[in-house]
Amino acid sequence: MEGTAVLGGLGARLRLPWREATIRAIREETPSAKTLVLDVPGWPGHAAGQHVDIRLTAEDGYQAQRSYSIASAPGSGELELTVELIDDGEVSPYLTEDALPGDGFELRGPIGGYFVWEPRLPDPLLLVGGGSGVVPLMAMLRHRRATGSTVDARLLLSARTIEDVLYREELEGLAAGSVDVRITLTRGEPPPGWDGFARRIDREMLAEMGPPPAEGPRAYVCGPTPFVEEAARLLVELGHEPARVHTERFGPTGD
């Protein structure tokens, strides 16, 4: 999740302490997105699908706060956030364009108990992401791989262009293994030899991805609010139980 989340549990959130996070390393994922590897003393650990709040404080005391999904798998020994640049944002421009290893900021978390996946869950896994909504879904896939889970896992990712696809090489590796990965591009012409989809996510696409509702899959949908609402609606229309369609949405600020 990248932006202001539409989430509950405000009371529990406010009880979490702010911690000092230091950037240990930075990786470029796309021309507009970077992954920050953080050192956070006292970090209690997290579950796949959770997120954190980040707070920046300017020299004049002005503070800006945004929420970002955790990209790293639980138990990996890393805390990683992938941040996509929002041109008119207050936080993402600093994190993607100005921040350097050794810089620090305040961090609060982990947050969230609804949009999480654990290897003990035996149900097939259907992941649907829009843009940077793939970040918490990647944490789930990384956790699945690290724990040796053999749960049926499928990922459908929507991106504007192939250059906007986060974790592209890693996704190709997962697709060559035990994860069914399909990408749909929504803008411009797809590259030569493209074997994915080239349209917005629709009912036919979701039905093709499966697993069928009769198998009782757990679906996790993350992305901008309109994307999530439409994908969740289509999944329910296809017969998926609403209680098994977990959603995480970006808020209106989009930063």
Regions found by a protein language model. Give the residues of each.
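A short, basic/flexible loop-to-alpha-helix module at the beginning of a structural domain
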Residues: P110-L121
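Reductase modules of NAD(P)H-dependent flavoproteins
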Residues: G8, L14-P17, D152-D255
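Ferredoxin-reductase
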Residues: L7-D103, A159-T161, L185-G188
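Short, conserved phosphate/pyrophosphate- and ester-handling motifs at nucleotide-, phospho-/glycolipid
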Residues: G49, G133, P224
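Histidine-anchored nucleotide/phosphate-binding helix
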Residues: P136-A146
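Hydrophobic/small residue at the entry helix of a nucleotide-binding pocket
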Residues: S132-L137, F227
